[in-house]
């Protein structure tokens, strides 16, 4: 079984309790070394096999997943933040579907919510803002249109909105 685990927004203690338990039980961990806080690996067992995916291709990552599954090992694919937001997990899930390897996702604390917490902010306030849009920086296209154009159209119909733009 492969578990996609969100590493949270950076601090090792911002991982979910479920995510921490999965790291503690994992036989194999594949993590994005350039993005994930290495302190999270301290939750791993001493005999856990740990792989930094920063220099691995998608094919090499999938091969490690296949090998772990064939050996009956529990594998954690540790992604930064919340895997469903800019996590690039779909291509891995598609490959696992093709191979018949079961997987499950464990959410993480997204950096956007970690930022709000550290600043003691609330994105939605009654009578002020009821909409939160999470988008990439300008230059990215959504249905062939620059994201900033989409935001402009949406904001024209909303009195006030909270906006968080990713840096990637």
Label the model's feature ranges:
Residues 1-109, 114:
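Class I S-adenosyl-L-methionine
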Residues 1-2, 103, 112-168:
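Beta-strand/loop-alpha-helix module characteristic of Rossmann-like adenine-cofactor folds
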